[in-house]
């Protein structure tokens, strides 16, 4: 493993009824010390399943967004994210989370 990047990374994930995939999505992002701090912020659109509960069990912070919309969820997440770098992901594991460390490293090199 490379030296930890001196950066706080927040992964923002909008959700609505994603209990089937949210755990895999969170776990797909390596949590092996590649950055100084890594956290997950779930912006939930009033799920009626166990999405919020499962995300919290994985250590994610969860915010219930009463206003509807995918874009709204991201706007809320961006405003709330405590990280220096914000990464966005879909809740259904569409994108390979294992690539997040390399993408953030590349971003930091370009800074």
Cite the ranges covered by each PLM segment.
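Structured catalytic core of nucleotide-sugar glycosyltransferases
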Residues: 1-111
